[in-house]
């Protein structure tokens, strides 16, 4: 069975969600959050209709990872 082609906006969606996730991380760090604090991050799968959230501890989040690193499915 052939794999469906990626939607043309998928790379942009991944980048935007990565910016949101990094901003969430930076804000938590700025506010003095503990490294063991669980936070919800947006799925970076690239699908516009995706609303999945991924719970990670602050210490599990890799700020330098590329867009598309956090995927729920």
Regions found by a protein language model. Give the residues of each.
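Polybasic/polar functional segments that serve as interface/processing modules
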Residues: 1-73
